[in-house]
Amino acid sequence: MTERTVLVTGGTGGLGSAVTAAFLDAGWRVVVPQREAGTDDGPVRVVADLLTPEGAARAVEVATAEPAAPLRAVVNLVGGYAAGGLVHETPVEEFERMLRLNLRPTYLVTRAALPHLVATGDGAVVCVSARAAVSPFPGASGYVTAKAAVRAFADAVAVEYRQRGVRCNTVLPSVIDTPANRAAQPDADHRRWVPPAQIAGVIRFLASPESAPTSGAGIPVYGRA
């Protein structure tokens, strides 16, 4: 019988599908919020708009609905990328969109889940930021700022909840080897990119009891990039 539930936001994307599969393979009950109804193919799917407090609360409600498998972990994958030129060339709306898309769901879902994670006495939050948060590149100030904010938020959660039995860590991937990224960068050396399954393994470890001593860490997952 499954004894643990993980809530995986962004669980249907290139990385998210690998993360979902990794937890299912390890015997977790996996809850995946999505904007539209999907097929029942393993994880528990819930229609929820994670940009709203109500949507985040709905996702957590489903994740905590099985008493035999209490919510033990939240994995925040929702995000997005857009280039915007130099700072003075980037429209304000685009800068704000990057912040909203990358930071707001992470904040809302984590906020809604924390009381339940505290109640278990052994909860974990894993936030996916990006290498750009610590090694910025030009032409994407909104994205860089948003991913840095995700890491800072995770650090704040780690400090505030360490003594309450909840740990929080951040994963910092470089370029992820997904079909979408290959299509966007067909001439890149894809051998240097990180396969989603390898990142998923790191995330699953950080959500597991084996990582109990670790909180407030930023884990680089760069491959050979």
Roles of regions detected by a PLM:
Residues 130:
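Residue(s) in the substrate-gating loop at a strand-loop-helix junction
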Residues 12, 20:
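N-terminal Rossmann NAD(P)H-binding glycine-rich loop of SDR-like oxidoreductase domains
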Residues 135-141, 163:
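Active-site loop immediately N-terminal to the catalytic Tyr-X3-Lys motif
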Residues 115, 158-160:
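Alpha-helical segment proximal to the catalytic Tyr-Lys
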Residues 85-87, 91-97:
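Substrate-binding pocket helix/loop in short-chain dehydrogenase/reductase
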Residues 163-166, 170, 178, 187-225:
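C-terminal helical subdomain
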Residues 110, 146:
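Active-site helix of classical SDR
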